[in-house]
């Protein structure tokens, strides 16, 4: 039986999910947090659905062994590939997943033209196709796969010339189509929002789902009387790659230095 003081487990293919973790910390400061970055297998966007599901199951099992009361799948690609299977695997655990913000973007656009930056895996998924069918039938959606962008962010290169050149190339087709709304369909991408702001029109709306995931987690925990109160424990971090590499990047993306454990699953 889960208890209020138990931690929330959050995981992603890499450090992108830290953008979601920041939103959770801001909205639910009493919640203790566990975070797993599967950096040894990043990016998920170019992997098969079967491969991603296996990784998600191993990481989910690990986080539950650490006592997590809820799981947050802070990865759009993993949600598309594995969310349904994880809900079947862990029926007793609250699972909050994420998906590209098609619904709010369709509501926000003024000219009916929406651009999407996402991984190849997300854009090819049946889940994304279903989102378009359900919420975007009245708007034009222009998708742009972004190979290489996750890797730049994983390296901590949020403002450098290579990242700028890559973003300029990725944005060009969307800007040529006159889109007035841009969906960030990967949890890594909010980390380059400041650079994006220099490359897109000031009036273009940029939408991601980190804050919405934090709100959904709050609703799920509250409905089951699992919201924590009081002082949260120090966040705990693990990576499947080199801990020292993640320790180097955490001050940049998380805002403070942290100790990182080695995940072997």
From Swiss-Prot:
The keyword NADP does not apply. InterPro entries: Asp/Glu/hydantoin_racemase (IPR015942), Asp/Glu_race (IPR001920), Asp/Glu_racemase_AS_1 (IPR018187), Asp/Glu_racemase_AS_2 (IPR033134), Glu_race (IPR004391). It comes from the Bacteria. The active site is at 75 (proton donor/acceptor), 186 (proton donor/acceptor). It is an enzyme of class 5 (isomerase). One of its GO terms (molecular function) is glutamate racemase activity. Pathway: Cell wall biogenesis; peptidoglycan biosynthesis. GO terms for biological process: cell wall organization; peptidoglycan biosynthetic process; regulation of cell shape. Its EC number is 5.1.1.3. Signal peptide: none annotated. Substrate binds at residues 12-13, 44-45, 76-77, 187-188. Keywords: Cell shape, Cell wall biogenesis/degradation, Isomerase, Peptidoglycan synthesis. It catalyses: L-glutamate = D-glutamate. Provides the (R)-glutamate required for cell wall biosynthesis. Belongs to the aspartate/glutamate racemases family. HAMAP family: Glu_racemase. This is Glutamate racemase. It comes from Pseudomonas aeruginosa (strain UCBPP-PA14). The gene is murI.
